[in-house]
UniProtKB/Swiss-Prot annotation:
Belongs to the bacterial ribosomal protein bL19 family. One of its GO terms (biological process) is translation. It comes from Dictyoglomus turgidum (strain DSM 6724 / Z-1310). This protein is located at the 30S-50S ribosomal subunit interface and may play a role in the structure and function of the aminoacyl-tRNA binding site. This is Large ribosomal subunit protein bL19. GO terms for molecular function: structural constituent of ribosome. GO terms for cellular component: cytosolic large ribosomal subunit. The gene is rplS. The keyword Transport does not apply. InterPro entries: Ribosomal_bL19, Ribosomal_bL19_CS, Ribosomal_bL19_sf, Translation_prot_SH3-like_sf. It holds the Pfam family Ribosomal_L19.
Length: 118
């Protein structure tokens, strides 16, 4: 039964998603439908969490707008997500970066990861 579900899900999974890790700064191009109009909204921020797996995989992206932290959860394999670009690789030692919610300024900065680092 599990194999049947995996094969079904594989059909709907996107293949062009880059490797994303918590701490990375990403730019998500998200399709928004407003009435009969459709537009692409670009949302750039730091990935603070990556959850689930397979077709249900989601990332939580956080950015600060006018001093207020804004978080948005994006399903990676949703047809509404046009594309995801990795702007910068971050070096962190945690899988969930929820502690960034309490931090601001320099203490909320994430060091850049070297390409040869794992």
């Amino acid at each position: 039964m599990d194999l049947i579900i995996q094969n079904l899900e594989k059909e709907y999974m996107k293949k062009d998603i880059p490797e994303i890790w918590p701490g990375d700064t990403v730019r998500v191009h998200y399709r928004i439908v407003e009435g009969d109009k459709e537009r692409i909204q670009v949302y750039e921020g730091v990935v603070i969490a990556k959850k689930h797996g397979g077709i249900r995989e989601t990332i939580t992206v956080r950015k600060v707008v006018q001093g207020v932290g804004v978080e948005r959860i994006f399903p990676l394999h949703s047809p509404l997500v046009e594309k995801i670009e990795v702007v910068r690789r971050g070096r962190v030692r945690r899988a969930k970066l929820y502690y960034l919610r309490e931090r601001k300024g320099k203490s909320a900065k994430i060091a850049e990861r070297e390409e040869n680092e794992g």
